[in-house]
Amino acid sequence: MRAALAALALVAAPALAQEADPKADFVADNLVAVFYHELGHALIDQLNLPVLGKEEDAADILSVLLVDEVWEPEAAQEIVANTAYAYALSAEEGEGDDPMYWDVHGHDMQRYFTHVCLFYGADPENRADFAASANLPEERAATCAEERELADESWWTYLQPLADQAPGTAISLDAAEDEFIAGVISEEIDTLNERFDLPQEITVDIESCGEVNAYYIPDESRILMCTEFAEFLWERAQAADL
């Protein structure tokens, strides 16, 4: 596990070195990934999508696909690297604890390798160094192009009609108690609104909710980004000495 953790630090390092504040990049990149994840839950709800497996896995997959769709390759790699790095940090912190087999989310290192695999699988020729630096085993790497193709076919079957009709029904930012989170999420909202016409409007609130989390609330068509989650990411970036 420590080898994988160290590897992701190296994967992220070239892109992070160009930025003025690597800690801010780590926090922002993870906020982007989580926001896309919650949007996945929203689309599953609004489009009444069939999910053959765990919904959390489907939302994770969409997060990687949207990062690749919205961002240029170098920036997308940084986001995926920082997101995977966060999973590796969580796994390291939980060493010695009994795995939470009851949890709806996959184990942190499973999510780590899935993120790396799906990103690598979109362009194996040009992302081989990324996969190698992230210690993606050859056995898994051999299937990543197929995994990515299946993910694209599955999600884009439903995303493409939304893209064809864009712009249309929009995502909007409502309450925003944290300026940093609001700045990050506002840019994503603007970009997504240009690319997709959603089934119904989604509002996003950034506010304290008493826990480190983010939610999609179906009855309200609302994504809640907890300020505690960003605080947790800042603490994690500080502890990792980014």
Indicate where each model-derived feature is located.
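Sec-dependent signal peptide recognition
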Residues: 1-7
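N-terminal signal peptide c-region/cleavage motif recognized by signal peptidases
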Residues: 12-14
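Short pre-active-site segment immediately N-terminal to the catalytic Zn-binding motif
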Residues: 19-33, 48-49, 236-242
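Extracytoplasmic
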Residues: 29, 54, 78, 110, ...
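Active-site recognition of the HExxH zinc-binding catalytic motif
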Residues: 33-46, 60, 64, 225
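An active-site-proximal "capping" alpha-helix that borders the catalytic cofactor pocket
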Residues: 53-70
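Catalytic zinc-binding patch centered on the HExxH motif and its immediate surroundings
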Residues: 205-239
